[in-house]
UniProtKB/Swiss-Prot annotation:
Any Pfam family: Carmo_coat_C
Source organism per UniProt: Carnation mottle virus (CarMV)
Residue span of region S domain, virion shell: 82-239
Keyword Transit peptide: no
Polar residues compositional bias, start-end: 74-86
GO MF terms held by the record: RNA binding; structural molecule activity
Protein name: Capsid protein
Length: 348
């Protein structure tokens, strides 16, 4: 660098300017290159006609890989590896129970549980793991202020425990709230931030794959089975570790059911009932093995509607159904109790 400065100082143009009293030239000649500031050095180079070496710059190119994951728990997931879902879904319709003896209903919190997560359960078929970052159960009343009765919500973080059947057992739960039927109430469930595997089968260990169990209790109403409100589940869940899509249809050969639980079958003699676990649109196909093996299916419940196309010769029935609430039933009557049936349920 000193050689460069000496060359510029000995430049005839700089020497001439120094003799004429130019301050920059005088400073360079008398005090040296190191005494100049950066801007003064640039001006001196221009005066001496000095051309700096040409530097080659490699242009920056955009990365074509996944971005690093964000640390915020509510931030979007890493592209191609995880997905964050924040939503509020209808969990259940709350019905009143008369007397002081409460009735109980419960749901296991697992992303593929259609009864708890009607929409998320479909997305969860593409992932192996999940992490819950926020979870709240909301009770929304749909009754008058004169309605008697109590509604209680509880949560057990161990889904393998037996659901409570008494008030004492319910209030032993680690987290619970209670309210009058005409008053809204939220149950904010604490989360642990753990990443769990998504349940694949009923044989999986509930302690490892399920987040917990939500419990609803009602009692003290003047009338039974009257709608008093609705339950909603509000959540933020991160799905991770993409995998091949799991089964999205439920099929049965009359005894064994495979796939997600859209309906719960029950058999009583020659009668088969398929109870739908959630509100939604469904296509149910029922097929027998002999002509006239079953009669035309019927719809049971105040919240179910749809069309049933039935052909006795084959026999086969195609049912396109809409359920406004859980618990609605499609009833099939067989000509004999031993007559096998096959049925498949699709989500529409």
């Amino acid at each position: 660098m000193e050689n460069k400065g000496e060359k510029i100082a000995m430049n005839p143009t700089v020497q001439t300017l120094a003799q004429k009293g130019d301050k920059l030239a005088v400073k360079l000649v008398t005090r040296g290159w190191a005494s100049l500031s950066t801007n003064q050095k640039r001006r001196a180079e221009m005066l001496a006609g000095y051309t700096p070496a040409i530097l080659a710059f490699t242009p920056r190119r955009p990365r074509m890989t996944n971005p690093p994951p964000r640390t915020s728990r509510n931030s979007p997931g890493q592209a191609g590896k995880s997905m964050t879902m924040s939503k509020t879904e209808l969990l259940s319709t709350v019905k009143g129970t008369t007397g002081v003896i409460p009735s109980f209903e419960d749901w296991v919190v697992s992303p593929r549980n259609v009864a708890v997560f009607p929409q998320l359960s479909l997305l969860a078929t593409n992932f192996n793991k999940y992490r819950i970052t926020a979870l709240t159960v909301k009770y929304s009343p749909a009754c008058s202020f004169e309605t008697n009765g109590r509604v209680a919500l509880g949560f057990n973080d161990d889904a393998s425990d037996t659901p409570p059947t008494t008030k004492v057992g319910f209030y032993d739960l680690g987290k619970h709230v209670e309210t009058a039927a005409q008053t809204a109430k939220d149950l904010v469930i604490p989360v642990d931030g753990k990443t769990r595997f998504i349940r694949d089968s009923a044989s999986d260990d509930a302690k490892l794959v399920d987040f917990g169990r939500i419990v609803l209790s009602t009692y003290g109403f003047d009338k039974a089975d009257t709608v008093v409100g609705e339950l909603f589940i509000q959540y933020t869940i991160v799905l991770s570790d993409p995998t091949k899509t799991a089964k999205i249809s439920q099929a049965s050969n009359d005894k064994v059911s495979d796939g997600p639980t859209y309906v719960v079958p029950s058999v009583n003699g020659n009668e088969l009932q398929l109870r739908v676990v959630a509100a939604g649109k469904w296509c149910i196909i029922v097929r027998g093995t002999v002509e006239g093996g079953f009669t035309k299916p019927t719809l049971i419940g105040p919240g179910i509607s749809g069309d049933v196309d039935y052909e006795s010769a084959r026999p086969i029935a195609v049912c396109e159904l809409v359920t406004q609430m859980e618990g609605q039933i499609l009833k099939i009557t067989k000509t004999s109790a031993e007559q096998p049936l096959q049925w498949v349920v699709y989500r529409m």
